């Protein structure tokens, strides 16, 4: 078993990605052909569940782009289900300390290394037990990325980096800026200083730093500092802003929804 994304990070090859929030296998396949190294299937802020994640994994599978899946929380039951449907690389949100990082790793490993439940006869990941020795190979193929998104997590970064089985640390600029008192302004100088310091610290520890940044100049700056997995856009944003720009070029006035109140 191989994990091409994990291998690329270990080799120090920067991986450029795109965030998928449309929660749709058709759009996932369309974007899988765009050439990105990785695609993030978002189960935290997009309307995904195990079934929709599965269909997107199936849609991406024929293409070189590598899927990364973000569960809604650091929950061993949800992690187990995502691994069974075929996710190999997980981005675990809102990890605050080393204990939570260790729990994330344990959820991805079969015993005795972890607590992942054994259900390979039912699992797409094992090709329904058609992969010889899957139970003994799976642990090494898992790639665990944890998100640090608060001042507390930043203060615990050194101990998080010491956790065995953590392959990368992703800095969440939106939540971090909010926690630092600059909600909606991840480009604030104090936030940027925290991000840049974290990237250098993560790389120095031999782990892969990652981030989502649609600002092209900043994304390139993070890559120069040593970031190894950088998402440079979001599908919903590309569609929304692209559609608005096209309408504006033809003089169409932007209108708010006609619905009033909750709909």
From Swiss-Prot:
One protein family per Pfam: HpcH_HpaI
Metal-binding in keyword set: yes
Keyword Cytoplasm: no
Binding site for a divalent metal cation: 149, 175
Domain of life: Bacteria
Active site: 45 (proton acceptor)
Pathway where this protein functions: Aromatic compound metabolism; 4-hydroxyphenylacetate degradation; pyruvate and succinate semialdehyde from 4-hydroxyphenylacetate: step 7/7
GO cellular component: cytoplasm
Record's keyword terms, sorted: Aromatic hydrocarbons catabolism, Lyase, Metal-binding
Cofactors that this protein relies on: a divalent metal cation
Textual note on the cofactor: Binds 1 divalent metal cation per subunit.
Protein family according to the UniProt entry: Belongs to the HpcH/HpaI aldolase family.
Function: Catalyzes the reversible retro-aldol cleavage of 4-hydroxy-2-ketoheptane-1,7-dioate (HKHD) to pyruvate and succinic semialdehyde.
Name of the protein in its database record: 4-hydroxy-2-oxo-heptane-1,7-dioate aldolase
Organism whose genome encodes this protein: Salmonella newport (strain SL254)
Gene this protein is translated from: hpcH
